[in-house]
UniProtKB/Swiss-Prot annotation:
GO terms for cellular component: mitochondrion. This is Acyl carrier protein, mitochondrial. Pathway: Lipid metabolism; fatty acid biosynthesis. It comes from Dictyostelium discoideum (Social amoeba). The gene is ndufab1. Belongs to the acyl carrier protein (ACP) family.
Amino acid sequence: MIRNTFKLVSNIAVRPAFSSTFVRQPIVASSMMVRNYGSISEKEITDRVIGVVSQYDKVSGKTVTPTTTFKELGLDSLDSADILVAVEEEFGIEIPDEEADKITSCAETISYLRKTPTAK
């Protein structure tokens, strides 16, 4: 008798939890929970790189274009390294040292970022 009563009570107590919470409610992902993994457009990359370079202290007041070299801006290798660190922070990536040594202009920075799928 006690065993049958316990079964009946436990079935009644468990049934609403499983039937309404786990079975009947559809699973819907809100758009806020979905990450868009599309690539960044070239225009956005260009604008952000120019923005990072333009904000560098030694560049203020100079015109920066996509084809501007760091040398034209009067920057040395340490300044270039500082800019590339800022670019890494801006795009959430890490540029390997051997690649960073090859980057000497905004155009090369943009080209590298276009080839980097993890840039955000």
